[in-house]
Amino acid sequence: MTPILFIDRDGTLIEEPSDFQIDAYEKLRFVPQVIPALLKLRDAGYQFVIVTNQDGLGSDSYPRASFDGPNELMLQIFESQGITFRDVLIDCSWPQDNAPTRKPGIGLMTAYLQDRSIDWARSGMVGDRITDLQFAENLNIRGFQLRTEQFGGEWDWPGIAHALADAPRIAVVQRDTKETKIRVELDLDRAGDARIDTGLPFFDHMLEQIGKHGGFALDIQAEGDLHIDEHHTIEDTGLALGQALREALGDKRGIGRYGFTLPMDETLASAALDFSGRPYFVFEGEFKRERVGDMPTELVPHFFRSLCDASGLNLNLQVRGDNDHHKVEACFKALARALRPALARQGTALPTTKGAL
């Protein structure tokens, strides 16, 4: 089955002028990043259909000849870049006509609604107006309102391509107990600066290493009973992060099983991991200091054990060295560097002969 992306024209593929009519070549300007985004979606198997309202097209105020030239040039430019459209559907009515073929109406969609080869679950609609979102709702497909000065909106083309083509592995976990409130958000397919606040600055710094060196977007916000002890905050953060990893990975298709050895001055840390679904943690290392910064060193292996329990991760972690700060940081970095290739998707096969992980 084939997914289709239905796309508005003015304000979505090409920028909309102040008079809302692209009736001259000099008015033709492409929306930023639209071509790379459509190429990515094309490579993901999408076909494209333009669905546009052109108020009074063919009337004296908007002659067809004024529309056709810029429109044909637009299509030729897209085609020169490898982008073709399965169809261009145009409604020429006025808003006051209330024509069923005018968006958000779906009168132009009859043939598509009867086409059983379309993957409607993956299909979507992109436009710059609320009527485009209503059109998507009427088709029961996902709608994206492109961000514009005229009509607002939340999306840009790279974000839309990521959302549709990458099937992004995103998770949001809220863990509330009597002792803590932990919120973890992550996107395994998007790199970004980690946003961490647990009330423990050194622990924050260690968690930042997981996002930065793991190559994924990570946001952790934690409130805990730090006036009593650090234990609950560190443990519950590990559990919430582990749960988020498990949820974002889904059925684990295409992922790998990896290890990484990381030196940090006199310290050497090694992490070997497997998202086997059977949590197990082995730690080899010793700390001389009771705490590093505001983090008790006895809770370092406890954090990793909590992470493994909640994510279904098998982790073997070894560290040796003289400086406890270096050893703790090397543990987090080694885990993150082992996570980076393990989380990367390569194909769609499951890395097991059992049929499930």
UniProtKB/Swiss-Prot annotation:
<keyword id="KW-0511">Multifunctional enzyme</keyword>
<keyword id="KW-0479">Metal-binding</keyword>
<dbReference type="InterPro" id="IPR013954">
    <property type="entry name" value="PNK3P"/>
</dbReference>
<dbReference type="Pfam" id="PF00475">
    <property type="entry name" value="IGPD"/>
</dbReference>
<dbReference type="InterPro" id="IPR036412">
    <property type="entry name" value="HAD-like_sf"/>
</dbReference>
<keyword id="KW-0378">Hydrolase</keyword>
<dbReference type="InterPro" id="IPR020566">
    <property type="entry name" value="His_synth_bifunc_HisB"/>
</dbReference>
<feature type="binding site">
    <location>
        <position position="8"/>
    </location>
    <ligand>
        <name>Mg(2+)</name>
    </ligand>
</feature>
<comment type="pathway">
    <text>Amino-acid biosynthesis; L-histidine biosynthesis; L-histidine from 5-phospho-alpha-D-ribose 1-diphosphate: step 6/9.</text>
</comment>
<dbReference type="InterPro" id="IPR000807">
    <property type="entry name" value="ImidazoleglycerolP_deHydtase"/>
</dbReference>
<feature type="active site" description="Proton donor">
    <location>
        <position position="10"/>
    </location>
</feature>
<dbReference type="GO" id="GO:0046872">
    <property type="term" value="F:metal ion binding"/>
</dbReference>
<feature type="region of interest" description="Imidazoleglycerol-phosphate dehydratase">
    <location>
        <begin position="169"/>
        <end position="357"/>
    </location>
</feature>
<protein>
    <recommendedName>
        <fullName>Histidine biosynthesis bifunctional protein HisB</fullName>
        <ecNumber>3.1.3.15</ecNumber>
        <ecNumber>4.2.1.19</ecNumber>
    </recommendedName>
</protein>
<dbReference type="Pfam" id="PF08645">
    <property type="entry name" value="PNK3P"/>
</dbReference>
<dbReference type="InterPro" id="IPR023214">
    <property type="entry name" value="HAD_sf"/>
</dbReference>
<dbReference type="GO" id="GO:0005737">
    <property type="term" value="C:cytoplasm"/>
</dbReference>
<keyword id="KW-0456">Lyase</keyword>
<comment type="similarity">
    <text>In the C-terminal section; belongs to the imidazoleglycerol-phosphate dehydratase family.</text>
</comment>
<feature type="active site" description="Nucleophile">
    <location>
        <position position="8"/>
    </location>
</feature>
<comment type="pathway">
    <text>Amino-acid biosynthesis; L-histidine biosynthesis; L-histidine from 5-phospho-alpha-D-ribose 1-diphosphate: step 8/9.</text>
</comment>
<feature type="binding site">
    <location>
        <position position="10"/>
    </location>
    <ligand>
        <name>Mg(2+)</name>
    </ligand>
</feature>
<dbReference type="GO" id="GO:0004424">
    <property type="term" value="F:imidazoleglycerol-phosphate dehydratase activity"/>
</dbReference>
<keyword id="KW-0963">Cytoplasm</keyword>
<dbReference type="GO" id="GO:0004401">
    <property type="term" value="F:histidinol-phosphatase activity"/>
</dbReference>
<dbReference type="InterPro" id="IPR020565">
    <property type="entry name" value="ImidazoleglycerP_deHydtase_CS"/>
</dbReference>
<dbReference type="InterPro" id="IPR006549">
    <property type="entry name" value="HAD-SF_hydro_IIIA"/>
</dbReference>
<dbReference type="InterPro" id="IPR020568">
    <property type="entry name" value="Ribosomal_Su5_D2-typ_SF"/>
</dbReference>
<dbReference type="GO" id="GO:0000105">
    <property type="term" value="P:L-histidine biosynthetic process"/>
</dbReference>
<dbReference type="InterPro" id="IPR038494">
    <property type="entry name" value="IGPD_sf"/>
</dbReference>
<keyword id="KW-0028">Amino-acid biosynthesis</keyword>
<keyword id="KW-0368">Histidine biosynthesis</keyword>
<feature type="binding site">
    <location>
        <position position="128"/>
    </location>
    <ligand>
        <name>Mg(2+)</name>
    </ligand>
</feature>
<comment type="similarity">
    <text>In the N-terminal section; belongs to the histidinol-phosphatase family.</text>
</comment>
<keyword id="KW-0460">Magnesium</keyword>
<dbReference type="InterPro" id="IPR005954">
    <property type="entry name" value="HisB_N"/>
</dbReference>
<dbReference type="InterPro" id="IPR006543">
    <property type="entry name" value="Histidinol-phos"/>
</dbReference>
<feature type="region of interest" description="Histidinol-phosphatase">
    <location>
        <begin position="1"/>
        <end position="168"/>
    </location>
</feature>
